Amino acid sequence: MNPTNQRDIPLYIYHAGQCDPKKCTGRKLARFDLARLYDRISRLPRSAILLDPTVEKALSPADDYKKGIIVLDCSWEEVERVFPDLAKLNLKHRALPYLLAGNPVNFGRPFKLNSAEAFAAALYILGHKEQAEKVLSKFNWGHSFLELNKEPLEEYATAKNSTEIVEIQSHYF
């Protein structure tokens, strides 16, 4: 993966091999050289932030995200089984705040984001809107995610820390 400019945040995917390869957003991002794909947990970069829907601390600009962001590309039915394995790695686990999925599989469902949406949300919140748009541009439904979540994403991007993210989130549900 080559960031297109020096300020792009490195994106990493742990691919659990549970999805349809033709519909896999993680694989597609790797094909376009927007993210690096890993099939072994042991090879993930230890200094990156793992987006984890099972934790309470929200991702915010206060986090040290320069070393990259990791998403777990797996079936939502397997999340409860796979994340405990990742907990052993001593990564910085952060959750994304309340957002609606814009993809055709989980459209309009809160928190049920796919890998591309998770990356885009994190990038947007961290002030890397152009990189977020670049990630979503590879999917014909990508604009739907941004349209559905425009207002909360803009507000989350103004937060300084996790506490403020959670406070803003409380306005949306």
Curated annotation (Swiss-Prot):
<comment type="similarity">
    <text>Belongs to the TDD superfamily. TSR3 family.</text>
</comment>
<comment type="function">
    <text>Aminocarboxypropyltransferase that catalyzes the aminocarboxypropyl transfer on pseudouridine corresponding to position 914 in M.jannaschii 16S rRNA. It constitutes the last step in biosynthesis of the hypermodified N1-methyl-N3-(3-amino-3-carboxypropyl) pseudouridine (m1acp3-Psi).</text>
</comment>
<feature type="binding site">
    <location>
        <position position="96"/>
    </location>
    <ligand>
        <name>S-adenosyl-L-methionine</name>
    </ligand>
</feature>
<keyword id="KW-0690">Ribosome biogenesis</keyword>
<dbReference type="GO" id="GO:0106388">
    <property type="term" value="F:18S rRNA aminocarboxypropyltransferase activity"/>
</dbReference>
<dbReference type="Pfam" id="PF04034">
    <property type="entry name" value="Ribo_biogen_C"/>
</dbReference>
<dbReference type="InterPro" id="IPR007177">
    <property type="entry name" value="Tsr3_C"/>
</dbReference>
<dbReference type="GO" id="GO:1904047">
    <property type="term" value="F:S-adenosyl-L-methionine binding"/>
</dbReference>
<protein>
    <recommendedName>
        <fullName>16S rRNA aminocarboxypropyltransferase</fullName>
        <ecNumber>2.5.1.157</ecNumber>
    </recommendedName>
</protein>
<dbReference type="InterPro" id="IPR022968">
    <property type="entry name" value="Tsr3-like"/>
</dbReference>
<dbReference type="GO" id="GO:0000455">
    <property type="term" value="P:enzyme-directed rRNA pseudouridine synthesis"/>
</dbReference>
<feature type="binding site">
    <location>
        <position position="115"/>
    </location>
    <ligand>
        <name>S-adenosyl-L-methionine</name>
    </ligand>
</feature>
<dbReference type="InterPro" id="IPR007209">
    <property type="entry name" value="RNaseL-inhib-like_metal-bd_dom"/>
</dbReference>
<dbReference type="GO" id="GO:0005737">
    <property type="term" value="C:cytoplasm"/>
</dbReference>
<keyword id="KW-0963">Cytoplasm</keyword>
<keyword id="KW-0949">S-adenosyl-L-methionine</keyword>
<keyword id="KW-0698">rRNA processing</keyword>
<dbReference type="Pfam" id="PF04068">
    <property type="entry name" value="Fer4_RLI"/>
</dbReference>
<feature type="binding site">
    <location>
        <position position="25"/>
    </location>
    <ligand>
        <name>S-adenosyl-L-methionine</name>
    </ligand>
</feature>
<keyword id="KW-0808">Transferase</keyword>
<feature type="binding site">
    <location>
        <position position="72"/>
    </location>
    <ligand>
        <name>S-adenosyl-L-methionine</name>
    </ligand>
</feature>
